[in-house]
């Protein structure tokens, strides 16, 4: 599963042998983006944060070209094209790490990136693993926004049922189906098989 750097996921990976945790490049990128905002505009383009963002952008650009490939072809291209970019990024950050110091947004960004290196490299080893979890986060965004509206759900069972319905709706969307029509189909067809 592709996740942010929340330690619980890494603990779960150690406990569950079949689980592989992959790091999310968007989360890593976000740390550098936030660090860049506190750097004066005049010197921003010469900063380590800016240069790291440009390197991450180059990785994403190359990854975008692989979208229509099979997972096997994507894996080959990861090794040939993208792995050297990722290697160069981590080498660059490690070489400049001491110049940053131990505090501030940029130091946090560098620490996060280096602590997550193992997980951020997972997508290079498997053509089916995406670089980030944006697709998943987009899918749950509506659920998170609607959280206030669902405060009226006052039982565990009600919450579980809401989650099931929401999951079915998101699955329909992910498969290019119209959720309303899909529910209509399910509610018509399921009783026929009971």
Q: Over which residues does each language-model region extend?
A:
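Catalytic center-proximal scaffold of phosphoryl-transfer enzymes
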Residues: 1-194
């Amino acid at each position: 599963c592709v996740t942010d750097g929340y330690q619980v996921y890494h603990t779960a990976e150690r406990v569950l042998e079949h689980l592989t945790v992959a790091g999310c490049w968007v989360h890593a990128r976000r740390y550098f983006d936030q660090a860049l905002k506190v750097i004066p505009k005049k010197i921003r383009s010469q900063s380590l944060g800016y240069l790291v963002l440009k390197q991450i952008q180059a990785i994403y650009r190359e990854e975008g070209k692989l979208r229509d490939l099979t997972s096997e072809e994507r894996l080959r291209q990861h090794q040939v094209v993208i792995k050297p970019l990722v290697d160069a990024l981590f080498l660059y950050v490690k070489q400049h790490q001491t110049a940053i110091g131990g505090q501030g947004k940029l130091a946090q960004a560098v620490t996060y990136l280096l602590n997550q290196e193992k997980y951020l490299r997972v997508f290079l080893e498997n053509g089916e693993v995406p670089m980030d979890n944006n697709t998943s986060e987009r899918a749950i965004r509506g659920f998170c926004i609607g959280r206030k509206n669902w405060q009226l759900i006052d039982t565990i069972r009600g919450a579980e049922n809401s989650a099931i319905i929401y999951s079915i709706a998101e699955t329909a969307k992910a498969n290019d189906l119209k959720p309303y029509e899909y529910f209509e189909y399910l509610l018509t067809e399921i009783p026929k098989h009971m």
